[in-house]
A protein has these predicted regions:
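Short aromatic/hydrophobic "clamp" motif used to bind/position activated sugar donors
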Residues: 91
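Acidic donor-binding segment of Leloir-type glycosyltransferases
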Residues: 27-69
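Glycine-rich, basic loop-to-helix element that forms the pyrophosphate-binding segment
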Residues: 70-86
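The conserved acidic donor/metal-binding loop of glycosyltransferases
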Residues: 95-98
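N-proximal low-complexity "stem/linker" segments adjacent to membrane-targeting elements
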Residues: 1-32
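Local beta-strand N-terminus motif with an aromatic residue
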Residues: 9-10, 38, 88
Length: 98
């Protein structure tokens, strides 16, 4: 496979709100993709079920993951916040319960 520096950076924005039961599988799927030049932006929208802590744990394991914690503002605000920090040439959204 090509060096990731020659491939375009893809930003993946994942809104997260109380999805602890699904989040690990979602993040394993994203992190396990064969395309490696990814920026994974997790927007924790004030989760109270441990989802935010799980986001932090994954960020410690994988340097491509950025976590933003905020008070609950809704999925549209999460997506907009992710767009504001995304640096990729290409962009995608993944729902955390996918």
């Amino acid at each position: 496979m090509e060096n990731t520096e020659t491939l375009p950076l893809i930003s993946i924005i994942v809104p997260v709100y109380n999805v602890k039961n699904y989040l690990e599988k979602c993040l394993q799927s994203i992190c396990g993709q064969t395309y490696k030049n990814l920026e994974i932006i997790l927007i924790d929208d004030g989760s109270s079920d441990g989802s935010g802590e799980l986001c932090d744990l994954f960020a410690q394991r994988d340097g491509r993951i950025k976590v933003i914690h905020q008070t609950n503002a809704g999925q549209s605000a999460d997506r907009n916040r992710g767009l504001a920090v995304a640096q990729g040439e290409l962009l995608g959204f993944v729902d955390s319960d996918d």
